[in-house]
Curated annotation (Swiss-Prot):
This is Large ribosomal subunit protein uL5. SUPFAM superfamilies: RL5-like. It comes from Kineococcus radiotolerans (strain ATCC BAA-149 / DSM 14245 / SRS30216). Coiled coil: none annotated. Belongs to the universal ribosomal protein uL5 family.
Amino acid sequence: MTTTTEARALPRLKQRYRDEIKGQLHEQFSYGNVMQIPGLTKVVVNMGVGEAARDSKLIDGAVRDLTAITGQKPQITKARKSIAQFKLREGMPIGCHTTLRGDRMWEFLDRLLSLALPRIRDFRGLSPKQFDGNGNYTFGLNEQSMFHEIDQDKIDRVRGMDITVVTTATTDDEGRALLRALGFPFKEN
């Protein structure tokens, strides 16, 4: 009994990382071991919806948008503590986030770099200073309409999002070199 399994196509960015970028980084930083070459671990996309404390239906729009953008259902973030000034109670939904790993992560980054970021009006590049000291990079987008998965007519309100790219790099310079090689458009100082 033989079964034929179709090999899924490798994401374009992952193929480029394996074929070209790993070799470039190995030469640039002259690692002694191939396991020291920095790679991507995960991408976390977070959408905070502070207004959901007053109107709990707003979280549904954020979940719908994030599902369309990332291709997987996000987890709803709930308030840890009650804060009277914000009329916030413990356990109220205040946002949603999703963690992308594997092929979904590579496909999301490919869409982000080749389709979404070029659609931003007056885009001058990402800030190269937003690394955390360990090679991880976080940046914010102030509207979801730049993703082509979102139907412009069905947007109920403009929502921003935070995107964190977690790498195995140990320093900011290694992380910056990895992300620049992947095609992240950093501003030149």
